[in-house]
Amino acid sequence: MTSRSLLPFVLSLLLPRIIMAQSYLELYSHQWLNNWKSLHLLNELDGQFPLHCLKESMNFKLPAEMLHPHQFQQENATEAIHDLLQQIFNIFSRNHSQTGWDEAIVEKFLHGVHQEMVWLELFLEEEMGWENSTLRRDISLHIKSYFKRMMDYLKGRNYSSCAWEVIRMETKRSCLVIYRLTRKLKK
């Protein structure tokens, strides 16, 4: 009789974890595919990095936390992915007229990034209530500082085509970080 009365209690403890694990697996699949599409579109913009722009490359100092995604919990990884996408969207919404890039590809890229941000926001609100932890604020500030350095670089170079190529390559690096963070969602 005692085991029968414990079953509903045990199920009530386990069920939310099972549902959350399933949600993260779905998020992982969705995020992995969209990140792949973003990288593909960034490659489509201009192909290989122009050699004459090599002298303009710069180290934007990717936040140290991003280099060690194994330290993230799933919810922090999800929030970091969202922050990275938000900053990528902000920077690519700027003046890129000097690049010669196909505007349709840029728009498709921005649309995909925006859709992913909305999807992540819904996930964060539904699954976790999206509480702003201290860790999250610290990570968010580091990500914003990283992208501010990128934006300052672009402005300082008057949004030149070489400056945009450097930013495009750095954004591809950010997409690789997103991929590494996305793998954290699978666990």
Swiss-Prot record:
This is Interferon beta. Glycans are attached at residues 76, 95, 132, 158. It comes from Tachyglossus aculeatus aculeatus. Keywords: Antiviral defense, Cytokine, Disulfide bond, Glycoprotein, Phosphoprotein, Secreted, Signal. It is found in: Secreted. It comes from the Eukaryota. PANTHER family: INTERFERON BETA (PTHR11691:SF73), TYPE I INTERFERON (PTHR11691). Disulfide bonds join 53-162. The modification Phosphotyrosine is found at residue 24. The keyword Kinase does not apply. One of its GO terms (cellular component) is extracellular space. Belongs to the alpha/beta interferon family. Its main location: secreted. GO terms for molecular function: cytokine activity; cytokine receptor binding. Residues 1-21 form the signal peptide. Monomer. GO terms for biological process: defense response to virus; immune response; negative regulation of Lewy body formation; neuron cellular homeostasis; positive regulation of autophagy. Type I interferon cytokine that plays a key role in the innate immune response to infection, developing tumors and other inflammatory stimuli. Signals via binding to high-affinity (IFNAR2) and low-affinity (IFNAR1) heterodimeric receptor, activating the canonical Jak-STAT signaling pathway resulting in transcriptional activation or repression of interferon-regulated genes that encode the effectors of the interferon response, such as antiviral proteins, regulators of cell proliferation and differentiation, and immunoregulatory proteins. PROSITE patterns: INTERFERON_A_B_D. Pfam families: Interferon.
